[in-house]
């Protein structure tokens, strides 16, 4: 009943109005899985390749008809007749057929869409929710937890058209007892922040991930206005709400220096920028910092881990790109203590699960993440619960492409009840 009988690829539109790949996988029992590939803006240089057409006369070169053709042609032919429940085999067939290190033949966007659609179809054929099927694929059947959200309420960097260098300023509702309560707390702070920004004459337009994107005098000012909003919403900073940042430092790394254009082109060495971040953690309850240095600055990361790693969660995104080879090197060298997990950085569900397992086995945490270009596909919610990853980044409290994931988490928590605990701050490395 789980044999693949049809695969359909199509070009759809993501949350930025750019094309992306959607795949349908049909099984002989009439079961269907539907999944879409997300797309990043600030991308690591070692990510699996997102195949774009490059035809400037169509979607400004961002079309994905080549990737869709790969789904409808060679990929479909290769997986027809195969058992969708054997996820590792489905993924291996596609990866081997592509034959490149970075999936550049078919595109990670093509392979990932089929990989996730096959998993959804297989879950349906087993009569299981997707999170339960993922837990079985993960070798941890029935072991679930609800993730602590990192809510990106001020957007900067590549995610917004403003003067803020650091890409994401996030809140974590650690005082919540349930995921649903965490979402309520996040929503209240988000709306209160709008009032705070308006009272200061600042804009409340939102960025790619649904957070506000005001022009600010400094990166520290973003933390200050969030702190004000937390208090005005009736919460205590550090007890009810903690803070997290994604520096995406590769985006402002120039000629061996970290240059903050929004602060008058202030320039820092790796060590200086580490201490700049350390000073912020002394002023505010920041418990997690992502990509605090450039992805290639491993010597700097070793220093940053030495200085901050025993008290702050240091998350590698561009640094590790959900790649087990790179992650293993980082673990061996004591670089960072957490990995950001993005399906499309590596391009298949099987490889994603391997990265989560490797991180956990090494004592690193794993933070499941969206991309800045998203769709209504909420698979990452099921991934977070099904692997008991413990943390999720899926944007702010606006934009349907972000809220779709929160709503799926609410549904899952309702279905699982006490069998999926919400552990709050305990999930964060160093806390």
Swiss-Prot record:
Co-factor binding details: Binds a second Mg(2+) ion via substrate during catalysis.
SMART domains: Enolase_C, Enolase_N
Catalytic machinery residues: 209 (proton donor), 342 (proton acceptor)
MF-aspect GO terms: magnesium ion binding; phosphopyruvate hydratase activity
One GO biological process term: glycolytic process
Keywords, sorted A to Z: Cytoplasm, Glycolysis, Lyase, Magnesium, Metal-binding, Secreted
Residues noted as binding (2R)-2-phosphoglycerate in the record, renumbered to the chain: 167, 342, 371-372, 393
Enzyme Commission designation: 4.2.1.11
Catalysed reactions listed for this entry: (2R)-2-phosphoglycerate = phosphoenolpyruvate + H2O
Source species, domain of life: Bacteria
Root EC class: lyase
Binding site for Mg(2+): 246, 290, 317
UniProt-annotated location(s): Cytoplasm; Secreted; Cell surface
Names of the cofactor(s): Mg(2+)
UniProt cross-references to InterPro entries, sorted A to Z: Enolase, Enolase-like_C_sf, Enolase-like_N, Enolase_C, Enolase_CS, Enolase_N
Function (record text): Catalyzes the reversible conversion of 2-phosphoglycerate (2-PG) into phosphoenolpyruvate (PEP). It is essential for the degradation of carbohydrates via glycolysis.
Subunit structure: Component of the RNA degradosome, a multiprotein complex involved in RNA processing and mRNA degradation.
Similarity-based family: Belongs to the enolase family.
PANTHER family: ENOLASE
Protein name: Enolase
Native species: Pectobacterium atrosepticum (strain SCRI 1043 / ATCC BAA-672)
């Amino acid at each position: 009943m789980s044999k693949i009988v049809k695969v359909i690829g199509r070009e759809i539109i993501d949350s930025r109005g750019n094309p992306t790949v959607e795949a349908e996988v049909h099984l002989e029992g009439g079961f269907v899985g539907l999944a879409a590939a997300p797309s990043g803006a600030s991308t690591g240089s070692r990510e699996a390749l997102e195949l774009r057409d490059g035809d400037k006369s169509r979607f400004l070169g961002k079309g994905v008809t080549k990737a869709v053709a790969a789904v409808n042609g060679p990929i479909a032919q290769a997986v027809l007749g195969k058992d969708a429940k054997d996820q590792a085999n489905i993924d291996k067939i596609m990866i081997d057929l592509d034959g490149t290190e970075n999936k550049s033949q078919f595109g990670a966007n093509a392979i990932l869409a089929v990989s996730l659609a096959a998993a959804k179809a297989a879950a349906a054929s087993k009569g299981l929710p997707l999170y339960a099927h993922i837990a079985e694929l993960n070798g941890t059947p029935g072991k679930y937890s609800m993730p602590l959200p990192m809510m990106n309420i001020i957007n900067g960097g590549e995610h917004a058209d403003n003067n803020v260098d650091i890409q994401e300023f996030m809140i974590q509702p650690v005082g919540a007892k349930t995921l649903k309560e965490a979402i309520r707390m996040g929503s209240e702070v988000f709306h209160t922040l709008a009032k705070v920004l308006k009272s200061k004459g600042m804009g409340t337009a939102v960025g790619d991930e649904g957070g506000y994107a005001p022009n600010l005098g400094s990166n520290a000012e973003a933390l200050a206005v969030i702190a004000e909003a937390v208090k005005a919403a009736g919460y205590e900073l550090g007890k009810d709400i903690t803070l997290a940042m994604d520096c995406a430092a590769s985006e402002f790394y120039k000629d061996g220096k970290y240059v903050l254009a929004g602060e008058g082109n202030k320039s820092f060495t790796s060590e200086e920028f580490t201490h700049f971040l350390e000073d912020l953690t002394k002023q505010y309850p920041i418990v997690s910092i992502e990509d605090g240095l450039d992805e290639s600055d491993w010597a700097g990361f070793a220093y940053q881990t030495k200085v901050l790693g025993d008290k702050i969660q240091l998350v590698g995104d561009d640094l590790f790109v959900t790649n087990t080879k790179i992650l293993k090197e980082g673990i061996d060298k004591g670089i960072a203590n957490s990995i950001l997990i993005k399906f499309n950085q590596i391009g298949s569900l099987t490889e994603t699960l391997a990265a989560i397992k490797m991180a956990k086995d090494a004592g690193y945490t794993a933070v499941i993440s969206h991309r800045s270009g998203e769709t209504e596909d909420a698979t990452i919610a099921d991934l977070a619960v099904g692997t008991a990853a413990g943390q999720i980044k899926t944007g702010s409290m606006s934009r349907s492409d972000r809220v779709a994931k929160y709503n799926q988490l609410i549904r899952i928590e309702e279905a699982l009840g006490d069998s999926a605990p919400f552990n709050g701050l305990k999930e964060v490395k160093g806390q």
